């Protein structure tokens, strides 16, 4: 299958809130569009472990009433969000891609999930993870080619966003489990500094970091900052800080280009696309420092 960036259009949420405010759209209607997309694409993409449709509809109805009353809880009030199945959710099982945890219902939400609910987000479902966040992948496919991997371990979160099933999802990372599937699926994603978003529960002593996948950079930032502003950072750590809207971009003065071992194996199309990116950066006035680093 050839890659077609037009096959799926990533959903955005930040541009829907004006319609919520003027009554021309509602969070419930937005959710129904997400559910319809999931019903159509999930049989192939296999991004979800659990979909909690009725609970999501109830949350979307409550959000619709808040927007109607001009009293949204936040800029993401009504946003459908998926949760990687490593993070605890009290009304859905947290099974971590592992048979030993089938039917495991935690008593509490993970701190990030709690913060999302406090902000009015609609918890859409639990997304597939590699077993225990490790190397054994789940059934999720890449939305642009079902024969290819979406990357892991936040595979379901990345694939669901890329397939246009929802505008954002939460992933977690130790080695590359947020940014790798985001790259494979073409999403925006943020891996904050460790401890920048409070992890809570059983992950409090792990090396993991929680962060969002999203179809737009605006939604990516908004989800991250809304969580951090409520849950804070880990004890003893400075939480993620910044404006409540997307920060203004800053052009870097210089960037280092590292040609690692994978560079020699890169296919011609990928190499050409990367070189074009470098050329665009140079034309924009960014100084590039190139080196080969095979250590």
Task: Please place each PLM-identified region on the residue numbering.
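An N-terminal boundary/leader segment
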Residues: 1-57, 283-285
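A short helix-breaking turn/cap at a secondary-structure junction
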Residues: 191-277, 284
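Enzymes and membrane/adaptor proteins characterized by extended Gly/Ser/Thr/Asp/Glu-rich
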Residues: 75-109
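Short glycine/serine-rich loop segments
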Residues: 108-227
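Conserved hydrophobic/aromatic pocket- or pore-lining residues that grip, position, or stack substrates
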Residues: 56, 78, 84, 116, ...
């Amino acid at each position: 299958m050839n890659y077609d960036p037009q096959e799926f259009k990533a959903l955005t949420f930040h541009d829907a809130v004006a319609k919520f405010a003027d009554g021309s759209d509602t969070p419930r209607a937005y959710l129904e569009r997400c559910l319809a997309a999931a019903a159509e694409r999930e049989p192939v993409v296999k991004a979800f472990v659990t979909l909690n449709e009725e609970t999501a509809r109830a949350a979307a109805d409550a959000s619709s009433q808040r927007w109607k009353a001009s009293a949204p809880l936040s800029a993401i009030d009504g946003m459908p969000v998926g949760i990687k199945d490593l993070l605890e959710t009290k009304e859905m099982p947290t099974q971590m891609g592992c048979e030993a945890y089938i039917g495991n219902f935690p008593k509490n939400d993970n701190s990030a999930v709690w913060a999302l609910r406090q902000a009015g987000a609609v918890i859409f479902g639990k997304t597939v993870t590699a077993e225990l966040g490790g190397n054994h992948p789940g059934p999720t496919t890449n939305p642009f080619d079902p024969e290819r991997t979406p990357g892991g371990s936040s595979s379901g979160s990345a694939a669901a966003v890329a397939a246009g099933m929802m505008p954002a999802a939460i992933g977690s990372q130790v080695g590359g489990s947020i940014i790798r599937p985001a790259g494979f699926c073409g999403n925006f994603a943020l891996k904050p500094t460790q401890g920048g978003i409070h992890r809570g529960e059983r992950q409090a002593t792990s090396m993991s970091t929680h962060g969002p996948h999203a179809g737009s950079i605006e939604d990516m930032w908004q989800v991250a900052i809304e969580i951090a502003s409520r849950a804070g950072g880990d004890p003893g750590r400075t939480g993620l800080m910044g404006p409540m809207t997307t920060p203004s971009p800053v052009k870097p003065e210089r960037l280092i280009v590292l040609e690692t071992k994978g560079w020699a194996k890169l296919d011609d199309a990928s190499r050409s696309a990367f070189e074009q990116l470098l050329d665009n950066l140079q034309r924009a006035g960014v100084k590039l420092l190139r080196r080969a680093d095979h250590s």
